[in-house]
């Protein structure tokens, strides 16, 4: 738990970027919800990106966000994402569960980089390929079960 509290940022549709250790009130504001004509993702991208780049400047970036939150922030340096494939198709509905499995793995092994994560993958995940697209390193994992 300490690892997650110290190493995880969460993108909230209402509060923007928060630390896992931040205390937030209970709220219901669904992903993609709108407040009149206010584009919340545009607001966060315009007003928080510079501070977030500064905060993360010395960190290895592992981006486990849902694709929706790409609109909130685009890293300005190398970062890694994970994509999950099952039977040749991209997993979207259960991707959140697999991102959670990776985060739990990171916490368990106190991962500092992707090599450590890939060396400790659970038996139901296998490295399929690594694609480099500009600053983004996309690690594709095959779900075996």
For the regions a language model picked out, list residue spans one by one.
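Internal, well-folded beta-alpha domain core
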Residues: 1-145
């Amino acid at each position: 738990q300490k690892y997650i509290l110290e190493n995880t940022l969460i993108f909230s549709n209402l509060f923007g970027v928060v630390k896992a250790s931040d205390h937030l009130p209970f709220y219901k504001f669904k992903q993609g919800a709108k407040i009149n004509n206010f584009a919340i993702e545009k607001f966060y991208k315009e007003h928080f990106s510079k501070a977030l780049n500064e905060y993360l400047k010395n960190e290895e970036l592992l981006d486990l966000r849902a694709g929706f939150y790409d609109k909130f922030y685009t890293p300005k340096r190398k970062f890694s994402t994970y994509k999950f494939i099952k039977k040749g198709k991209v997993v979207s509905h259960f991707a959140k569960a697999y991102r959670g499995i990776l985060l739990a793995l990171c916490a368990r092994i106190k991962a500092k980089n992707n090599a450590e994560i890939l060396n400790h993958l659970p038996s139901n995940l296998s490295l399929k390929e690594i694609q480099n697209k500009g600053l983004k390193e996309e690690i594709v994992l095959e779900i075996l079960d």
